[in-house]
Amino acid sequence: MPIKIDSNLPAHKLLENENIFVMTEERAVSQDIRPLKILILNLMPTKIETETQILRLLSNSPIQVEAELLQTATHEVKNVSKEHMLKFYKTFDDIKNERFDGMVVTGTPVENMEFEQVDYWDELCRIFEWSKTNVYSSFFICWGAQAALYYKYGLKKYQLDKKMFGVFEHVSLDTFHPLMRGLDDKFWVPHSRHTEVRRGDIALIKDLQILSYSEKSGVHLISDMECRNFFSTGHSEYDRDTLAKEYFRDVEKGLDIDLPENYFTDNDPSKTPEVKWRSAANIIFSNWLNYFVYQRTPYDLSTL
């Protein structure tokens, strides 16, 4: 998917170096089509790394995408320059009168806190409520998924005895669902979290369907019955070295952290990790964009 982003965004050069088609404004306006407008609410502290990961996945089909980066105004960003945030990110007040074909909400490492304790929780709730009328389809990732499930359905998260950390095998529970089309019988997904949502709780909510599951890491993909909201408990967007960075960071801090499972070659952290989740990640995001955004969203977004 040709993706239209600011040519000065760090992700632009990184993606071009990977031979990913990044479209300039000049090229985009010369094409007589309406691009999909996708809003990315980036809650992660690693802003540049995460925005690049999400943009990479959004670029993998022939439809033109125009991505907009969103931050929460009620949280002070410390891991990236203010210049970067001012130049490339908007706040809710900037976009609240706009409409979007799709929205991606990332995770963030605040899961050990109660939702209401997160400093931008009220703002996030306003964005969730706004998205009901201003966004056609949304894709929520990890803590973003837990937060949305809690806001929309009152679904609780539970503390795990040990961090769910590694790359785990999953199966589809509905192979005929369009989001699952093209996936292998078993596919791999990275997870990195201290909390979980439970299958039994989800089963009590008639508006939700579990699409994929892992015997080790539990519920993975969830959809509402309208197929306008999708929730992922994993991190399909992760790079080869993302879990390694998290592991070595925690080791440096002296934290009690196990090796990520099914990740390092020969379970040896000195060896390069083997990527086995990328094809599934591309399929899931391409299916979401194609079947649930491109094929369903109105041409005139004002009619949402």
Locate each region found by the language model.
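Cysteine-nucleophile active-site neighborhood
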Residues: V105-D174
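Amide-donor transfer/coupling interface in amidating biosynthetic enzymes
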Residues: M1-T74, Y89-I95, R99, R126, ...
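N-terminal beta-loop-helix "entrance" segment that forms/cooperates
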Residues: A73-L86
